[in-house]
Regions:
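N-terminal regulatory/effector-sensing and dimerization cores
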Residues: 20-103
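Cyclic nucleotide-binding regulatory module and flanking cytosolic helices
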Residues: 1-18
Length: 103
């Protein structure tokens, strides 16, 4: 599994720009963030995300969730969160693939 994640991470790093990059596949996006980012309030729409590299922390109410390479995040409904990228750099950016779920 680690090799599959590493291969996906290498592909996303090559194919994506900083931030969100759309793909030819509907509802599929590539994320690349090359620096740590402090807490940002967001509303996640229904989505499934696979973290490929780096680390992201989400605060949902009183819960703090940490996502690293190989972890998945699923939101089945609109979800207000505070998110921050806690592990990312220019040489080793935070990378993820997301699939928006039609509601």
């Amino acid at each position: 599994m680690d090799q599959v994640i590493a291969e996906l991470a290498a592909t996303v790093a090559r194919k994506s720009e900083e931030g969100l990059t759309a793909t030819p596949m509907p509802n599929v996006g590539l994320y690349k963030v090359s620096r740590c980012i402090d807490l940002l309030p967001e509303t996640y729409r229904p989505v499934v995300s696979l973290i490929l590299q780096g680390e992201k922390q989400l605060s949902i109410g009183d819960e703090i969730l940490i996502y690293r390479a190989g972890h998945t995040f699923t939101a089945a409904l609109d979800l207000p969160v505070l998110g921050k990228i806690t592990e990312a750099s220019a040489s080793r950016p935070y990378l993820a693939i997301s699939l928006a779920i039609a509601s």
